[in-house]
């Protein structure tokens, strides 16, 4: 753990992710920043264009906020394990944030699966936050699997990575949890994406235990909500907007069995 011992002020930037109208959000941000300056004795100074600290407030479903802090003045070491990445890789800081938000729904010693694991970041961050017993990562992209194995080794994680299509995957026992960064649509049509999500929910129902959990990061809110409407075997537990600009959401969904 590293910390600063300084006598001069730190400059910060505030970012708010909420459903507030823009004018109210701007007013709230100004008042919040001013109060931060006052309470810190001006050791924290609002400087949106030249800052050392980034504060991010994420509105929760109950109306409260989760607060995240990023120190840009300390060299990153927390995510040094991520030596390999591919184009679709999630940033490890984002993965860590998603797992932190989903933590109330996660359990220790679970058997977990990432069906589109890429270079393994979601599984690694999940196990760091809440240790699991058995961890499986699947990806159709061989280069990603090779990178995932190396990243897991650097992180000191024991994860079973398999180069396979999720829809062809079978296993001897059921899983407590499926956690994944869902593939982006790319060049797929709406009809193809709709069919993909239908297949995904059907396949996952065959791999999850009763009361098992889906933790999904996706910008296809409409297709996920459609599956929740037409399928009685799933129930939405939590939904959180993460990136408002391009509509990426975190979903926590229970499989009722």
PLM region spans:
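Non-catalytic nucleic-acid substrate-recognition regions in nucleic-acid-modifying enzymes
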Residues: 1-48
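Class I S-adenosyl-L-methionine-dependent methyltransferase catalytic core
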Residues: 19-23, 28, 43, 47-52, ...
